Amino acid sequence: MSHASLVRRDRDRLLPADPTTRSVARALYERVADAPIISPHGHVPVEWLVEDRPFSDPASLLITHDHYVTRLLHASGVGLDELGVGGSAADPRQVWRRFAERWPLFAGTASGYWISESLQNVLDVTVPLSAATADEAYDRIADQLATPELRPRALFERFGIEVLATTDDPLDDLAGHAALAAEGAVGRVLPTFRPDRYLDPDAAGFAQNVERLVAETGSPGTFAGYLAALSLIHI
């Protein structure tokens, strides 16, 4: 079955609608468009860059591990187990089909925008995503992911990233960051302090996490010790 190709969208689509303002915005953008990327926040696991393995399949890359995507799909009636969330077994192709069937839900969302950008400009998918084109798009992406150009380090270089900040648990040993720095194969990959699981008493496992935090830092099991542990681990 043949399908109409994706329409390449206007290059100014994110700029202001007013013509005068748009021309100024375009001029400003063009001055920095080729500058390297300094990314102060992200969710790229450092292991991706350390191991530099090919991404396994389209679903795990774009759907299963993106909570913005899975939440919207779940709100439309798709079970989280059907999406492979939480370690549940799910066939990647079936996950992709569920996603493609509900692709119109993502119109006007940030997730829809960046997935569209990835499909067109990185993964070279040339058909509009839908239930009818799900398998065609899946196979195209799978073929692309098997190439050296789509491995993590190659993408790091392709995107012009100079600095990438990861999101890290305070008790992470940061061995991956040390290994990358020693190897020097990619730009700077820096850890950032993300103590969320130690700050929300309503979160699952909060008590156990705090106990581990104070134990790892040798702090007393008091509120003052808890604050001291957070301060010590941040340093």
Give, region by region, the residue ranges found by the protein language model.
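Metal-cofactor-binding active-site regions of metalloenzymes
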Residues: 2-36, 42-232
